[in-house]
């Protein structure tokens, strides 16, 4: 609260007048202090509600006004009950493009008016995990937004540790392209391409041509592999994958292993990226990997899977799991700005924020709507 000594005379006089005569002064405080937000109200039920507008809680916080957000497959997993850390009542969302409205006293890299990408990972930059290059496991952050704290599917969002959790946009790149750099492309790149050790002249198979699988596709090409094989049930998605640079596409079915072996002359695949998150696709990856190869899992698994060590124990394979750290975001911004990658092509549907419940309905039945990634505009 302001003290009277700091208020200009007009405000002091108004204050005295109001106190003396008990005047009722109209206010818009409620409309200014509340906002619309998409809430995990119950299992299977996204609900648009009115919530209090967030405020600065710590000097390292920023408050941002959302410009665009999107829906992640992980949000759907939350509604299925697969994410135990996310409680009902949570405002969802961990991706977005926004404008900084307010910063805490300790925020030094950003100021009100800056247009930013909101990272899906909150990083304090100082804990042992952050210093070891694993901000996804930050002891005061990590995957917090839309999980353990309120997220970006709201008109305003509080961003903890703003200096380590926001990135300035590239002015010459589209907002839709940079929205995909909040999570989708960094996840495909870091968890798939980097963990999978994609390299010059190698062979790559990506099981699942959804947004994250396509993120792995466009970034794997930075390393000039010999073959990139996309595998999916959806032929339209495979058609887009071919347009984005896949050398081969395979419609998943009873003969998928034989088809991939034919493409690779019977050797199998050096890097298999699992980008779906169900037992059947994890088993398929184990059948496709070559001797000495890597299975890089980036799918979110909500059920137990089988690891067939009776078949793999002597194949010298590597199996990796990872939560995205989003350390690659500054580099990916440069690639988008230069036109080297074009993730805006993932955006197939646009909605106004007031229609976000409909956006969830469409994204939840993505194949029926030929939907890859929805963009929600404020």
Predicted features along the sequence, with ranges:
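Mid-domain Rossmann-like dinucleotide-binding core that forms the NAD(H)/NADP(H) cofactor-binding site
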Residues: 171-254, 258-259
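NAD(P)H dinucleotide-binding glycine-rich loop of Rossmann-like/cofactor-binding domains
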Residues: 124-207
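N-terminal mitochondrial targeting presequence
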Residues: 1-34
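C-terminal hydrophobic helical "lid"/dimerization subdomain
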Residues: 33, 235, 283-287, 326-378
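Glycine-centered, small-residue-biased loops immediately flanking beta-strands
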Residues: 293-294
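Glycine-rich beta-strand-centered segment in the early N-terminal region that forms part
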Residues: 52-69, 82-131, 170-173
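Rossmann-fold NAD(P)-binding glycine/threonine-rich loop
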Residues: 299-316, 331-334
């Amino acid at each position: 609260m302001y003290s009277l000594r700091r208020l200009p005379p007009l405000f002091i006089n108004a204050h005295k007048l109001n106190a003396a005569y008990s005047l009722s002064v109209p206010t818009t405080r409620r409309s200014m202090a509340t906002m619309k937000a998409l809430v995990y109200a119950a299992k299977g039920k996204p609900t648009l509600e009115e919530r209090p507008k967030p405020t600065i809680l710590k000097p390292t916080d920023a408050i941002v006004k959302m410009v665009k957000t999107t829906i992640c497959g992980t949000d759907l997993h939350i509604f299925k009950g697969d994410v135990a850390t996310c409680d009902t009542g949570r405002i969802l969302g961990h991706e977005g493009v926004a404008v900084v409205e307010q910063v805490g006293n300790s925020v030094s890299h950003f100021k009100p008016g800056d247009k930013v990408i909101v990272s899906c990972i909150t990083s304090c930059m100082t804990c042992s995990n952050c210093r070891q290059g694993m901000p996804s496991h930050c002891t005061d952050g990590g995957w917090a937004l839309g999980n353990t704290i309120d997220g970006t599917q709201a008109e305003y969002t509080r961003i903890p540790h703003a200096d380590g959790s926001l990135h300035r946009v590239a002015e010459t790149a589209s907002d839709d392209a940079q929205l995909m750099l909040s999570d989708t492309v960094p996840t495909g790149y870091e968890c798939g391409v980097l963990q999978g050790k994609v390299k010059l002249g190698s062979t790559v198979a990506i099981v699942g041509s959804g947004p994250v699988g396509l993120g792995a596709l466009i970034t794997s090409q930075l390393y000039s592999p010999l073959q990139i094989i996309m595998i999916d049930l959806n032929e339209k998605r495979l058609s887009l994958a071919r347009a984005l640079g896949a050398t081969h596409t395979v419609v998943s079915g009873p003969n998928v292993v034989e088809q991939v072996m034919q493409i690779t002359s019977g050797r199998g695949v050096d890097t298999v990226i699992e980008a779906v998150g169900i037992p059947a696709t994890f088993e398929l990856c184990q059948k496709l990997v070559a001797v000495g190869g890597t299975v890089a899992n980036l799918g979110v698994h909500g059920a137990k899977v089988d690891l067939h060590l009776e078949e793999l124990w002597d194949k010298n394979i590597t199996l990796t799991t990872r939560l995205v750290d989003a350390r690659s975001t500054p580099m990916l911004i440069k690639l988008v700005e230069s036109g080297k990658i074009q993730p805006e092509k993932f955006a197939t549907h646009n909605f106004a924020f007031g229609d976000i419940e409909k956006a969830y309905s469409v994204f939840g039945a993505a194949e029926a709507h030929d939907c890859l990634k929805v963009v929600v505009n404020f």
